[in-house]
Amino acid sequence: MKAKNISYLIACMLMFCSLNTQAQNVFPYPALPDTLRSVEQRATYLSEHYWDNYQFADTTQLKNEEITEQGFVNFIDILARFNDEIAQKGISAFTAKAYAQKPAKEKFESLIEHYFDDPQSPMRNDRVYSFFLAEMKKSPYFDEAEKERIDFKWKAARKNLPGTMATNLSFKLEDGKMHQLSDYQNEKVILYFYDPECENCHKVTAWLKKQTIPAEYRMLRIIADDQISATYSIKAMPTIYLLDKGNIVVLKDCTPELLISVINNN
């Protein structure tokens, strides 16, 4: 299930979600108080109160994809547009309610894994995913074995997030020579991790060759061996990163379409 067409302007999204619809097959969005004037105030309120009208104990509602899954998809879609503080507040409020009953816990664990951990998901976002995992680690509704598994995923999700310096690594390019990522700190870099035998890699490579990539960007095509895959938590091939000068991560594990959009609109 994909996110519905929600405006990229946060203000418009807030107006949409503030409609307190009474339709039976629509997620019960909260009504935003008229006293909240600034976009930040409205975003914070929406984030914290998004699930106020949702009945986590109602198993019939829980099984309704148009309500539960679509509501969750829209939730994580807007969280990705909020800053860390606002997103974390929303996830904390969600966590306090979502896992108290076993059916809801199982349902939302499944949705979180599907939309954030599946390499084919178009909504992957390790920044937001790490916030969910951090709250799950603190929740009393997960046992120690579950928390150990969650902690492993949290550590992987926190690696090389946008805004941080990419982990240095040694790699061999097509010239047969060994290189260090740190050798390219003065350049804008596209890291293209691939497997020579990966059919999807061939398709993406062919597509990228048809695109316009500005001369200021250097593409490093790196065969992802086991060590590199572990260092960068690579889940599928190809995996693409965009780095600014200083090896600062701009995009982590992005789609080729997003890569081209960003580098041609900067």
Predicted regions located by residue number:
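Oxidative protein folding and maturation machinery
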Residues: 23-168, 173
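Non-catalytic, surface beta->alpha helical segment in thiol-disulfide oxidoreductase systems
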Residues: 245-266
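Thiol-based oxidoreductase modules, predominantly thioredoxin-like and allied folds used
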Residues: 215-227
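Structural micro-motif
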Residues: 232-241
